Structure formats: C-alpha cells, structure tokens
Amino acid sequence: KMCFIGDGNNMANSLIVGGLKTGMSVAAATPADYRPDPEVLDFAKPYGDKFLLTSDIRAAAEKADVVFTDVWASMGMEEEAEKRRAAFKGYQVNEELLGLCAPDAMVQHCLPAHRGEEITDETFEKHANEIFDEAENRLHAQKAVMVKLMAGK
C-alpha cells in the first residue's frame, strides 16, 4: 500500500494514477480544500476499494508500505505560504504516523523538503537514504526521457 500525505497537487495526482495503474492500493490524505485534480479522482473511481481519499492521515497511513509527502507551498506560492501552513498543520509525516505503517515502511519526498513542516527532522534523517535515492533515480529517468525526445523517431 502506498499513501500520500499533504497537498493534492501534481505529486499526489501522479502517484494516484501510477499506483493504481500498477495494481497498488493507494491512499491520499489531504485537507478538503486541497484535494487531487477532479479528473484524477474520476480516473480512480473504477478502482473502488483500491483507492482511499480522506482527510484523516491516520486512516491513509494505516499499514502503508511507502509514505510520500511533498512541500506544503511549492515554488511560486510564497504569498500563500502562511495560509497553507495553517491548512496543512496536521499533515506531517513523523515517527508517530509511521508507527501506523508497515514495520519496514519507506518514506519518500520529491525534495526539497521543508523540515519541521511536512516532515520532521527525525523522520527525514532516518529515511534520508531512501529519499535521496528517489531524487537520484528521478534524475536518471529524466535523462532517459531527454534522450528519447532528442533521438527523434
């Protein structure tokens, strides 16, 4: 089971679609005003009990094998940062939340992280190798896309 905690933005949207397409159970916990894209939610409907959208981070994290999070205010949203911090205050990935997950659950973050906001320092440090591996692997995937695009046919 994969879960996403935070803003129902591009990361959440991609994880929901990708996770469901590959047969995973996916849970997303977001505040009501920050839900994933309606088209993504329509896509998820046929998957029934393989998808959970909730405001309850505990329900989303329960028995999760991997937990994803992202910043609460992305680049270009600086003017909304305080409002978003207030809205997402209870949506932090921390050791207490991970206690609800599978015993060997992984934590992922697309970086850069705002430690103390969406993820605690302790949790980030404990899972830093996994988090940085994700960032490195994303670089290789991006390079492969560039090669494909530049190669033409």
Identify the meaning behind each predicted range.
Residues 7, 85-86, 133:
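Conserved short-loop catalytic and cofactor-binding motifs
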Residues 10, 14, 36-39, 55, ...:
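Conserved active-site and cofactor/substrate-binding residues in soluble primary-metabolism enzymes
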Residues 14, 18-21, 43, 96, ...:
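Alpha-helical scaffold segments in soluble metabolic enzymes
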Residues 45-121:
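Rossmann-like adenosine-cofactor binding region
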Residues 2, 26, 107-108, 145:
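Hydrophobic/aromatic residues located in beta-strands of well-ordered beta-sheets
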